[in-house]
């Protein structure tokens, strides 16, 4: 998961100018995964960030295009859901804040994540799709 540790004059971690950096990081990650995972492994993820094209473009199309509602339990810890409220400079996004605040009146205590505008999405694809996408062979 990317944190806001790469924000500068070129923008935040998902800025167009930084696609190469992010893909290099992911290439190194999947080179490591390929050494220990079985060839028929499936890569799965879950995040609200799969709503964002700038994030999806970092992954193989088969993975990014597999988006569907996340059905596992969702906990409000870390930035898995809260991250959508802040920008790359860790400032509050007023539009997102306003949606969350407006939704508090109907808040379901059993599902507080539903107050956020971008719900978590689940994605998955074969490891081979990642190896091919990052030029690591299949």
Task: Annotate the PLM regions.
Residues 38, 108-111, 135:
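Short, flexible coil/linker elements and helix-boundary hinge sites characteristic
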Residues 66-129:
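Accessory, usually C-terminal, subdomains that scaffold auxiliary metal cofactors
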């Amino acid at each position: 998961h990317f944190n806001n540790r790469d924000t500068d004059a070129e923008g935040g971690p998902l800025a167009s100018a930084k696609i190469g950096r992010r893909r290099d990081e992911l290439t190194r990650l999947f080179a490591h995964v390929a050494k220990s995972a079985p060839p028929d492994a499936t890569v799965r993820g879950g995040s609200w960030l799969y709503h964002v094209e700038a994030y999806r473009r970092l992954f193989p199309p088969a993975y990014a295009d597999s988006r569907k509602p996340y059905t596992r339990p969702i906990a409000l810890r870390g930035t898995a859901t809260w991250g959508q409220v802040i920008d790359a400079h860790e400032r509050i996004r007023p539009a997102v804040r306003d949606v969350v605040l407006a939704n508090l009146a109907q808040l379901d205590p059993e599902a507080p994540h539903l107050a956020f505008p971008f719900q978590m999405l689940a994605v998955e694809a074969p490891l081979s799709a990642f190896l091919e996408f990052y030029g690591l062979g299949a």
